[in-house]
């Protein structure tokens, strides 16, 4: 699924993109915004993100339970309830994530 719409030629054309190459910069932007909010609150930036994500818990993600990846040696991985190799914990929900990461 191509989840992002990218403007080209100054907004004259649009293209849909997906995958890690699209998602990684989006998540980097989310973390940058949260770090800015933390600095404004007199707190340090997050640093190593994994411990903070696990502290927030699965409630800051939308669990993707259908679909599967394709390719690879095993022919892809199915999405499932909870953590899975296809979607991890799922998609980030910005507001709950920001609330948790700015508060802690």
Residue ranges and their predicted role:
Residues 1-104:
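Extracellular protease catalytic domains of secreted zymogens
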